Amino acid sequence: MKVFSAVLIILFVCSMIIGISEGKEIPVKCKHSGQCLQPCKDAGMRFGKCMNGKCNCTPK
């Protein structure tokens, strides 16, 4: 059971790293994630969130 939990955690961390690397930052300033939805869709990405005052878009 401990091995299964360790493998599950490793897979979760790897998927987070892959998801972050696929994203791209666009030059749109924001204060909350709701402001990023339309600019990210216009950039050809599906989702967006506000990180450090700029929109970060991801394809998933």
Swiss-Prot record:
UniProt-listed Pfam families: Toxin_2
Disulfide bonds: 30-50, 36-55, 40-57
Compartments reported by the entry: Secreted
Tissue-level expression: Expressed by the venom gland.
GO cellular component, one term: extracellular region
Primary subcellular site in the record, as a coarse category: secreted
Keyword entries, A-Z: Disulfide bond, Ion channel impairing toxin, Potassium channel impairing toxin, Secreted, Signal, Toxin
N-terminal signal peptide: 1-23
Molecular function per GO: ion channel inhibitor activity; potassium channel regulator activity; toxin activity
Keyword Magnesium set for record: no
Transmembrane segments: none
Domain-level remarks: Has the structural arrangement of an alpha-helix connected to antiparallel beta-sheets by disulfide bonds (CS-alpha/beta).
Protein family: Belongs to the short scorpion toxin superfamily. Potassium channel inhibitor family. Alpha-KTx 03 subfamily.
Function: Potassium channel inhibitor.
Name assigned to this protein: Potassium channel toxin alpha-KTx 3.16
